[in-house]
UniProtKB/Swiss-Prot annotation:
Residues that hold Mn(2+) 2 according to the record: 86, 118, 168, 242
Functional summary from the UniProt entry: Protein phosphatase that regulates many processes such as microtubule organization at centrosomes.
GO CC list: centrosome; cytoplasm; nucleus
Keyword annotations of the record: Cytoplasm, Cytoskeleton, Hydrolase, Manganese, Metal-binding, Methylation, Protein phosphatase
SMART domains hit by this protein: PP2Ac (SM00156)
GO biological process: angiogenesis; brain development; central nervous system projection neuron axonogenesis; determination of ventral identity; dorsal/ventral pattern formation; double-strand break repair via homologous recombination
Protein name, entry field: Serine/threonine-protein phosphatase 4 catalytic subunit A
Residues holding Mn(2+) 1: 58, 60, 86
InterPro entries according to UniProt: Calcineurin-like_PHP_ApaH (IPR004843), Metallo-depent_PP-like (IPR029052), PPA2-like (IPR047129), Ser/Thr-sp_prot-phosphatase (IPR006186)
Claim: Lipid metabolism is one of the keywords in the record: no
Record text on subunit structure and interactions: Serine/threonine-protein phosphatase 4 (PP4) occurs in different assemblies of the catalytic and one or more regulatory subunits.
Highest taxon of source: Eukaryota
Family the entry assigns: Belongs to the PPP phosphatase family. PP-4 (PP-X) subfamily.
Length: 311
């Protein structure tokens, strides 16, 4: 099956199917990923995004909460979206979640930007659920392989109107400028260390300088590091995801770093609310807070114990 640009009949049908949380066929996944690859390969490591845009944090396979996000924030293409990674793992519907976002990307490439999170990785998804889910729903690892190949093509960061730097995790001691990010060869599995790893794994910390991350990857970075980076790159703030915040969003370092978290009642048990950030054409900020959607419980697997390790 081949989706030809200009004829979106099949793709529109697949989007409708995925919106109902119904799987598409394996050969359709293959074709969708091939098309997505053509689009993503053209994007920069620091993808330029124009305002107005709505910025979203981690989703983690919580499909019905993604639908709630679209309900409160507007559907694609009416609303322009930027998702900061971690589409998969932990939730029950990583397959449907990622494929819906990918199908929307192929259908409306200029209205949705997807950047890579630390869970968009072969190694991590084999531990935290996506691999097992693909196997359970498709009977083999083939769909997982198609999707993880696409992970390698996802952009590492984005910049809104040249002013707001968006990245999944945070900063790296190896990176002082956006141009240094632009030179990274991103088309690979997330390395265990180095600048690409740091962008996806690091966290802000109320300290100065750099610290050892308890996650075992990336770094903790302090307010002075942020001040230096923002000044050197003439940006007003860093927007990132990666950390659960109970209120859905959290400011750090005098409003120079913002954490946005978009998975309500994370892991179906944390009791947190979620947030998305609306930026208007003047980069004025408005937060939309939302709660978990009523869950569709049919067909849920019995919860497999996974390591309690919060990413």
């Amino acid at each position: 099956m081949c989706v030809i640009m200009g004829d979106f009949t099949d793709l529109d049908r697949q989007i409708e199917q995925l919106r109902r949380c119904e799987l598409i066929k394996e050969n359709e996944v293959k074709a969708l990923c091939a098309k997505a690859r053509e689009i993503l390969v053209e994007e920069s490591n620091v993808q330029s995004v124009d305002s107005p845009v709505t910025v979203c944090g981690d989703i983690h396979g919580q499909f019905y909460d993604l639908k709630e996000l679209f309900r409160v924030g507007g559907e694609v293409p009416e609303t322009n979206y930027l998702f900061m990674g971690d589409f998969v793992d932990r939730g029950f519907y990583s397959v449907e979640t990622f494929l819906l976002l990918l199908a929307l990307k192929v259908r409306y490439p200029d209205r949705i930007t997807l950047i890579r999170g630390n869970h968009e990785s072969r190694q991590i998804t084999q531990v935290y659920g996506f691999f097992d889910e693909c196997h359970r729903k498709y009977g083999s690892a083939t769909v997982w392989r198609y999707c993880t190949e696409i992970f390698d093509y996802l952009s590492l960061s984005a910049i809104v109107d040249g002013k707001i730097f968006c990245v999944h995790g945070g900063l790296s001691p190896s990176i002082q400028t956006l141009d240094q990010i632009r030179t990274i060869d991103r088309k690979q599995e997330v390395p265990h260390d180095g600048p690409m790893c740091d962008l996806l794994w690091s966290d802000p910390e109320d300290t100065t300088g750099w610290g050892v991350s308890p996650r075992g990857a990336g770094y903790l970075f302090g307010s002075d590091v942020v001040a230096q980076f923002n000044a050197a790159n003439d940006i007003s703030m860093i927007c990132r995801a990666h950390q659960l915040v109970m209120e859905g969003y959290k400011w750090h370092f005098n409003d120079t770093v913002l954490t946005v978290w978009s998975a309500p009642n994370y892991c179906y048990r944390c009791g947190n609310v979620a947030a998305i950030l609306e930026l208007d054409e003047h980069l004025q900020k408005e937060f939309i807070i939302f709660e978990a959607a009523p869950q569709e419980t049919r067909g849920l697997p019995s919860k497999k114990p996974v390591a309690d390790y919060f990413l």
